[in-house]
Protein backbone atom coordinates (compact mmCIF):
# COMPACT_ATOMS: atom_id res chain seq x y z
CA UNK A 1 0.00 0.00 0.00
CA UNK A 2 1.40 3.36 -1.04
CA UNK A 3 1.37 5.91 1.79
CA UNK A 4 2.37 9.57 1.91
CA UNK A 5 5.90 8.72 3.03
CA UNK A 6 6.29 6.79 -0.25
CA UNK A 7 5.55 9.88 -2.37
CA UNK A 8 8.64 11.44 -3.97
CA UNK A 9 8.89 15.11 -3.00
CA UNK A 10 9.84 18.17 -5.03
CA UNK A 11 13.62 18.46 -5.14
CA UNK A 12 14.18 14.78 -5.91
CA UNK A 13 15.87 14.55 -9.35
CA UNK A 14 13.53 11.75 -10.52
CA UNK A 15 10.74 14.33 -10.80
CA UNK A 16 12.75 16.31 -13.38
CA UNK A 17 13.75 13.36 -15.57
CA UNK A 18 12.01 12.29 -18.76
CA UNK A 19 10.62 8.89 -17.77
CA UNK A 20 11.54 5.80 -19.77
CA UNK A 21 8.94 4.05 -21.96
CA UNK A 22 7.89 0.55 -20.96
CA UNK A 23 7.88 -2.53 -23.18
CA UNK A 24 5.19 -5.20 -23.38
CA UNK A 25 4.29 -7.54 -21.95
CA UNK A 26 4.72 -5.54 -18.76
CA UNK A 27 6.80 -7.11 -16.03
CA UNK A 28 4.76 -8.19 -13.00
CA UNK A 29 6.42 -5.50 -10.88
CA UNK A 30 4.99 -2.79 -13.18
CA UNK A 31 1.52 -4.35 -13.15
CA UNK A 32 1.67 -4.41 -9.36
CA UNK A 33 2.85 -0.81 -9.30
CA UNK A 34 -0.08 0.20 -11.53
CA UNK A 35 -2.50 -1.51 -9.11
CA UNK A 36 -0.86 0.13 -6.09
CA UNK A 37 -0.95 3.58 -7.69
CA UNK A 38 -4.66 3.25 -8.52
CA UNK A 39 -5.36 1.90 -5.04
CA UNK A 40 -3.66 4.97 -3.53
CA UNK A 41 -6.04 7.21 -5.49
CA UNK A 42 -9.08 5.15 -4.47
CA UNK A 43 -8.00 5.18 -0.81
CA UNK A 44 -7.14 8.88 -0.86
CA UNK A 45 -10.63 9.75 -2.12
CA UNK A 46 -12.32 7.71 0.63
CA UNK A 47 -12.57 10.05 3.66
CA UNK A 48 -12.36 7.24 6.27
CA UNK A 49 -9.37 5.48 4.71
CA UNK A 50 -7.63 8.77 3.94
CA UNK A 51 -8.00 9.94 7.54
CA UNK A 52 -6.88 6.59 8.98
CA UNK A 53 -3.69 6.55 6.86
CA UNK A 54 -3.23 10.35 6.67
CA UNK A 55 -3.40 10.36 2.87
CA UNK A 56 -3.64 13.54 0.83
CA UNK A 57 -6.41 13.24 -1.72
CA UNK A 58 -5.27 12.75 -5.29
CA UNK A 59 -6.87 12.39 -8.71
CA UNK A 60 -3.69 11.34 -10.47
CA UNK A 61 -0.39 9.71 -9.61
CA UNK A 62 2.56 9.29 -11.97
CA UNK A 63 5.28 6.67 -11.49
CA UNK A 64 8.03 9.29 -10.92
CA UNK A 65 6.03 10.40 -7.88
CA UNK A 66 6.78 7.03 -6.31
CA UNK A 67 10.41 7.08 -7.39
CA UNK A 68 10.08 5.13 -10.66
CA UNK A 69 11.23 6.91 -13.82
CA UNK A 70 8.86 5.02 -16.13
CA UNK A 71 6.04 6.15 -18.42
CA UNK A 72 3.05 5.17 -16.27
CA UNK A 73 0.34 7.23 -14.60
CA UNK A 74 -2.91 6.40 -12.81
CA UNK A 75 -5.93 8.72 -13.06
CA UNK A 76 -9.12 8.58 -10.99
CA UNK A 77 -11.14 11.69 -11.77
CA UNK A 78 -14.42 12.43 -9.97
CA UNK A 79 -17.04 14.97 -10.96
CA UNK A 80 -18.28 17.60 -8.49
CA UNK A 81 -20.65 15.02 -6.95
CA UNK A 82 -17.80 12.61 -6.24
CA UNK A 83 -18.79 10.18 -9.02
CA UNK A 84 -15.86 8.79 -10.98
CA UNK A 85 -15.94 10.08 -14.56
CA UNK A 86 -12.53 8.81 -15.71
CA UNK A 87 -10.47 5.89 -14.40
CA UNK A 88 -7.42 4.58 -16.24
CA UNK A 89 -3.76 3.70 -15.98
CA UNK A 90 -1.80 5.20 -18.87
CA UNK A 91 1.32 3.40 -20.09
CA UNK A 92 3.55 5.30 -22.53
CA UNK A 93 0.98 8.10 -23.05
CA UNK A 94 1.51 10.68 -25.76
CA UNK A 95 -0.56 13.79 -26.38
CA UNK A 96 -1.19 13.66 -30.12
CA UNK A 97 -3.29 16.81 -30.39
CA UNK A 98 -4.51 19.57 -28.13
CA UNK A 99 -6.84 22.52 -28.33
CA UNK A 100 -5.51 26.02 -28.79
CA UNK A 101 -7.96 27.24 -26.15
CA UNK A 102 -6.68 26.84 -22.62
CA UNK A 103 -8.43 25.94 -19.38
CA UNK A 104 -7.37 26.16 -15.76
CA UNK A 105 -8.74 25.41 -12.32
CA UNK A 106 -10.11 28.43 -10.44
CA UNK A 107 -8.29 27.36 -7.27
CA UNK A 108 -5.04 26.57 -9.08
CA UNK A 109 -3.40 23.16 -8.90
CA UNK A 110 -1.73 21.12 -6.23
CA UNK A 111 0.45 18.05 -6.34
CA UNK A 112 1.16 15.18 -3.98
CA UNK A 113 4.89 15.78 -4.59
CA UNK A 114 4.73 19.51 -3.77
CA UNK A 115 4.14 20.18 -0.08
CA UNK A 116 3.71 23.95 -0.28
CA UNK A 117 0.84 25.92 -1.79
CA UNK A 118 1.91 27.66 -4.98
CA UNK A 119 -0.65 30.22 -6.08
CA UNK A 120 -1.49 31.02 -9.66
CA UNK A 121 -3.40 29.78 -12.65
CA UNK A 122 -1.99 26.77 -14.48
CA UNK A 123 -3.13 27.12 -18.11
CA UNK A 124 -3.45 23.81 -19.95
CA UNK A 125 -5.19 22.70 -23.14
CA UNK A 126 -8.97 22.48 -22.69
CA UNK A 127 -9.10 19.39 -24.92
CA UNK A 128 -6.58 16.61 -25.50
CA UNK A 129 -6.30 13.59 -27.73
CA UNK A 130 -4.07 11.01 -26.07
CA UNK A 131 -2.58 7.79 -27.40
CA UNK A 132 -1.56 5.25 -24.75
CA UNK A 133 -1.48 1.60 -23.78
CA UNK A 134 -3.32 -0.11 -20.96
CA UNK A 135 -1.45 -2.27 -18.46
CA UNK A 136 -2.49 -5.28 -20.56
CA UNK A 137 -0.93 -3.76 -23.68
CA UNK A 138 -4.16 -2.67 -25.37
CA UNK A 139 -3.54 0.35 -27.59
CA UNK A 140 -6.03 3.19 -27.11
CA UNK A 141 -6.67 6.71 -28.28
CA UNK A 142 -9.04 8.91 -26.28
CA UNK A 143 -10.30 12.47 -26.23
CA UNK A 144 -10.59 14.30 -22.93
CA UNK A 145 -11.87 17.77 -22.13
CA UNK A 146 -12.22 20.08 -19.16
CA UNK A 147 -11.19 18.67 -15.76
CA UNK A 148 -10.14 15.18 -17.00
CA UNK A 149 -7.94 16.86 -19.66
CA UNK A 150 -6.31 19.03 -16.99
CA UNK A 151 -5.59 15.98 -14.81
CA UNK A 152 -4.18 14.01 -17.75
CA UNK A 153 -1.98 16.94 -18.79
CA UNK A 154 -0.70 17.28 -15.20
CA UNK A 155 0.24 13.58 -15.02
CA UNK A 156 1.81 13.48 -18.49
CA UNK A 157 3.85 16.54 -17.46
CA UNK A 158 5.28 14.41 -14.62
CA UNK A 159 6.41 11.82 -17.18
CA UNK A 160 8.26 14.56 -19.05
CA UNK A 161 10.02 16.03 -16.01
CA UNK A 162 7.70 19.00 -15.49
CA UNK A 163 5.80 20.16 -12.41
CA UNK A 164 2.58 22.18 -12.44
CA UNK A 165 4.19 25.39 -11.24
CA UNK A 166 6.43 25.44 -14.33
CA UNK A 167 3.31 26.53 -16.26
CA UNK A 168 2.42 29.45 -13.94
CA UNK A 169 3.21 32.92 -15.31
CA UNK A 170 6.13 34.03 -13.11
CA UNK A 171 5.53 37.78 -13.61
CA UNK A 172 1.75 37.65 -13.08
CA UNK A 173 0.54 34.32 -11.64
CA UNK A 174 -3.14 35.18 -12.17
CA UNK A 175 -2.82 36.44 -15.75
CA UNK A 176 -4.75 34.47 -18.37
CA UNK A 177 -5.42 34.69 -22.08
CA UNK A 178 -8.87 36.18 -22.76
CA UNK A 179 -10.51 32.98 -23.99
CA UNK A 180 -9.19 30.75 -21.17
CA UNK A 181 -11.89 28.67 -19.50
CA UNK A 182 -11.73 28.87 -15.70
CA UNK A 183 -13.16 25.70 -14.16
CA UNK A 184 -14.50 26.03 -10.63
Curated annotation (Swiss-Prot):
Residues at which Fe cation binds: 111, 154, 158
Catalytic activity: N-terminal N-formyl-L-methionyl-[peptide] + H2O = N-terminal L-methionyl-[peptide] + formate
CDD domains, A to Z: Pep_deformylase
InterPro entries: Peptide_deformylase, Peptide_deformylase_sf
Keyword Metal-binding: yes
CC cofactor: Fe(2+)
Single GO BP term: translation
EC numbers for this chain: 3.5.1.88
NCBIfam families reported in the protein's UniProt record: pept_deformyl (TIGR00079)
Record's protein name: Peptide deformylase
Native species: Lactobacillus gasseri (strain ATCC 33323 / DSM 20243 / BCRC 14619 / CIP 102991 / JCM 1131 / KCTC 3163 / NCIMB 11718 / NCTC 13722 / AM63)
Amino acid sequence: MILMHDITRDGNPVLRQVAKPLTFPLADEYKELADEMMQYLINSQDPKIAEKHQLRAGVGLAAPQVGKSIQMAALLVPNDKGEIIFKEVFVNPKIISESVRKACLAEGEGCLSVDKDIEGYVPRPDKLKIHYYTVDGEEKTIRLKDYPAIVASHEIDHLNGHLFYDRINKQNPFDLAEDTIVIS
